[in-house]
């Protein structure tokens, strides 16, 4: 069996470019593989003389004759009588199948068992619904079919499958546009099509493709869906060969695209072309699945139909009355305007979706340049209800990309930056959804944003910026600059004033600025605020840019947003707003004096003297980097200092993060030591501030960290355990082992290392930014290089973006002056060799 399987796989891989071009060819390989397995299953079943007491059925992919290289062989064995005699023979039969290399998943049940299990579990019922008889008798087949016909009513089955699908979707963030999709289970993957067929079979009573093709409702959609299904089967077969898994990893994508022998476009790699084709087909399957579910739901929902001119409303859905649309082009946008102003209507019915999709060709240059349709689109952007879902529907029907042609270029556009987890278009819609949710209701932690977004003069400006902020990707060059021009031209075309169009364009051009500044620069430094204020110029721009930035980052990768990043952005916003409003701004020394006074208020007697002496050791920068709350907490810890031990404090911050304070005698290579200790204590550093006393004898270090071992919020007891672990690692530092952190295999990505050096002549320091792939003990390696080259780290901001990091260090020479260019070159060379 193994040799035949290898032959089928080798032939498939050898002819992959042909199969890729004509996906229906994959069915021969799937069927050949299934048939070979079937021969083995049946031959051995008969050799063990089991047919008198048992029947055997093929389930799942085996039942559909769609066996992939990594598929399990699903068997349903029906025991004819309750007291079977040849149980030992059956056990030896299953064992032999495993010995022959088959991954067997099987059940052994009597007819009564099937009745009980299939009646309770929709998954089991579905497996019998689609099973195929291998060795059986008409009598047993009839009994099984009779049980199935009475087990699940149509509506009950439909609801079960809908709930099952919703749970599955949650595992993939409810989108078919994940960058490394699971080709079996992701939304838009094979399971979506199979689920749609189960609904068609059980709820619509269609037995096969021919019945579906003859139907009035689905005849025009089934062929296209089958073509998409075939393509994704091609991709799954190839992925099973390359990795033996169903997830289409970045590494697999590159290997498979090479084997497909694709010809690249001007600005797109072949892998991008392949993945765009995947997402196009995944979207088609997702839409087909949705069509089937919505069609059944509409057919079983009783609601009065109300007529409103060209439209009708049934329940919470709106439709367009039948007839040609060639002279009713305005209805394409009018229907969305109607939804946007009616709270009780939230979607379009299935026949109308089909009608709109069939008439997308009416969106031509005349339509795009018509002032009336421009006004309609603006009205949609100003909708009171359902905006983000309407724009997503417009995209799914092909309307949005037909109207904004450049948007069509980013549909399915990959993002090989190792921190986005969605395609450009899916990320864009998540940005718009975040904006919409922020506008509708105040969310915990976003009270400021809720207030700001509802005070905007023109909400459509923000939505246009969100829609266009990444539209320049995949076109070659700086996507912000490309998008700025596209967005300005479009905004002008649809009727915005020059000033408003310029604002949209400026937002697109600068949409990365605020996140970059907050994550790389010291926002407690007045120069950082002054420089950013000069870029922004006024509070109107600042408000729009802040709202765009927050919602952009939140839509990038669910795992990357946290309260710390939010606080940095919010502080940058508030400080810049104060600057633009010309509010009185205290000097660095004034801030230090105020904060020191606030701290000293809570102490008295000998404690007051001790803390005053401690605080007197530091200059104004220490107080500017730590607010009064932090200073009070740190001072309280210092009072509990034990002779010969470092002062260590741990506390929760921003719900899921841990703030660490460590006061210790300053020494050469201290940052390197602390980083190693925290790493081996299970903590991942995302921000570090190092303050040294005036005589350089004491170092007060503050770290913001993430607990590496799980994402659950730690309780107080666990926080204390973390503190104890840090102290233990301090005491046993000389015997600590290296980090064993695991990261993904990223061999297919070029080894990147970008080092950027900016000298701050006023502070006599350097801002060193290092961009590279994440790897075990990376921060420790960087700290080691910096230490060996005679530099001292003043602050560090560790920005982990998925599998890529952008680490920014404020460093100075051991002589307390800026680092020379020659030394920076040595550091860069050493980092290149080490990383």
Task: Give the positions of each predicted feature.
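Conserved NTP/Mg2+-binding pocket subregion across the NTase superfamily
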Residues: 3-11, 91-192, 196-200, 705
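Divalent metal-dependent catalytic cores for phosphoryl transfer on phosphate-bearing substrates
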Residues: 65-89, 227, 423, 451-581
């Amino acid at each position: 069996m193994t040799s035949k399987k290898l032959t089928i796989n080798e032939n498939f891989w050898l002819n992959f470019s042909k199969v890729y071009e004509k996906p229906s060819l994959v069915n021969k390989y799937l069927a050949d593989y299934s048939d070979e397995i079937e021969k083995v299953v049946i031959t051995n079943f008969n050799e063990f003389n089991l047919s008198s007491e048992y029947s055997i059925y093929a389930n799942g992919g085996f039942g559909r004759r769609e066996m992939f290289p990594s598929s399990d062989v699903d068997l349903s064995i029906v025991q004819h009588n309750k007291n079977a005699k040849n149980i030992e023979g059956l056990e030896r039969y299953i064992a032999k199948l495993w010995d022959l290399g088959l991954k067997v998943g099987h059940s052994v049940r009597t007819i009564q068992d099937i009745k009980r299990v299939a009646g309770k579990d929709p998954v089991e019922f579905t497996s019998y619904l689609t099973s195929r008889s291998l060795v059986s008798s008409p009598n047993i087949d009839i009994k099984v079919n009779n049980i199935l016909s009475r087990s699940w009513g149509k509506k009950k089955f439909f609801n079960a499958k809908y709930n099952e699908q919703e749970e599955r979707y949650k595992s993939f963030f409810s989108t078919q546009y994940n960058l490394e999709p699971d080709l079996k289970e992701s939304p838009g993957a094979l399971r979506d099509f199979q689920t749609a067929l189960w609904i068609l079979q059980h709820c619509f009573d269609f037995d096969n493709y021919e019945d579906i093709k003859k139907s009035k409702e689905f005849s025009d959609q089934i062929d296209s869906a089958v073509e998409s299904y075939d393509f994704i089967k091609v991709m799954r077969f190839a992925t099973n060969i390359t990795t033996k898994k169903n997830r289409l990893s970045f590494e697999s994508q590159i290997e498979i695209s090479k084997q497909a022998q694709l010809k690249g476009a001007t600005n797109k790699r072949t892998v991008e072309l392949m993945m765009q084709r995947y997402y196009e087909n995944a979207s088609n399957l997702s839409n087909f699945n949705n069509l089937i579910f919505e069609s059944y739901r509409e057919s079983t929902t009783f609601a009065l139909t109300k007529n409103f001119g060209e439209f009708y409303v049934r329940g919470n859905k709106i439709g367009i009355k039948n007839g040609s649309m060639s002279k009713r082009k305005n209805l394409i946008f009018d229907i969305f305007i109607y939804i946007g102003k009616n709270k009780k209507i939230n979607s379009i019915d299935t026949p109308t979706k089909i009608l709109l999709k069939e008439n997308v060709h009416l969106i031509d240059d005349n339509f795009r340049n018509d002032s009336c349709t421009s006004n309609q689109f603006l009205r949609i952007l100003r909708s009171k209800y359902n905006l983000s879902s309407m724009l997503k529907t417009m995209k799914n029907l092909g309307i949005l990309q037909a109207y904004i042609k450049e948007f069509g270029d980013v549909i399915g556009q990959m993002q090989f930056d190792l921190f986005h987890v969605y395609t450009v278009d899916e990320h864009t819609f998540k940005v718009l959804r975040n904006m919409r949710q922020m506008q509708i209701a105040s969310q915990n932690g976003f009270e400021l944003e809720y207030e700001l977004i509802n005070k905007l003069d023109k909400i459509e400006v923000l939505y246009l910026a969100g829609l266009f902020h990444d539209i320049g990707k995949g076109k070659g060059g700086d996507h912000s600059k490309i998008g700025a021009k596209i967005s300005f031209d479009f905004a002008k075309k649809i009727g915005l004033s020059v000033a408003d169009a310029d604002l949209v364009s400026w937002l697109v051009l600068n949409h990365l600025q605020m996140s970059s500044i907050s994550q790389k620069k010291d926002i407690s430094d007045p120069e950082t605020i002054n420089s950013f204020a000069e870029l922004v110029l006024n509070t109107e721009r600042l408000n729009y840019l802040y709202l765009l930035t927050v919602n952009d980052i939140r839509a990038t990768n669910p795992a990357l947003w946290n309260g710390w990043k939010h606080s940095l952005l919010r502080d940058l916003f508030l400080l810049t707003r104060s600057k633009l409003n010309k509010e009185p701004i205290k000097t660095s020394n004034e801030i230090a004096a105020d904060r020191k006074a606030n701290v000293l208020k809570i102490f008295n007697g000998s404690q007051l003297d001790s803390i005053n002496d401690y605080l007197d050791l530091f200059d104004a920068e220490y107080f500017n980097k730590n607010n009064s709350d932090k200073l009070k907490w740190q001072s309280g810890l210092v009072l509990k200092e034990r002779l010969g031990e470092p002062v260590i404090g741990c506390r929760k911050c921003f719900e899921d993060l841990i703030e660490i304070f460590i006061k210790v005698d300053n020494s050469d290579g201290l940052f390197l030591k602390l980083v190693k200790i925290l790493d081996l204590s299970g903590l991942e550093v995302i921000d570090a501030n190092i303050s040294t006393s005036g005589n350089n004898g004491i170092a007060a270090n503050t770290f913001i960290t993430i607990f590496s071992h799980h994402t659950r919020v730690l309780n107080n007891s666990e926080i204390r355990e973390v503190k104890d672990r840090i102290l233990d690692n301090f005491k046993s530092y000389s015997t600590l082992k290296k980090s064993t952190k695991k990261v993904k295999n990223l061999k297919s990505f070029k080894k990147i290392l970008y080092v950027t050096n900016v000298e701050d002549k006023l502070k006599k320091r350097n801002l060193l930014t290092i961009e590279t792939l994440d790897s075990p003990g990376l921060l420790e390696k960087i700290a080691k290089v910096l230490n060996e080259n005679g530099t001292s780290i003043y602050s560090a901001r560790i920005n982990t973006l998925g599998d890529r990091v952008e680490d920014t260090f404020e460093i100075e020479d051991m002589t307390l002056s800026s680092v020379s260019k020659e030394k920076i070159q040595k550091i860069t060379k050493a980092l290149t060799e080490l990383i």
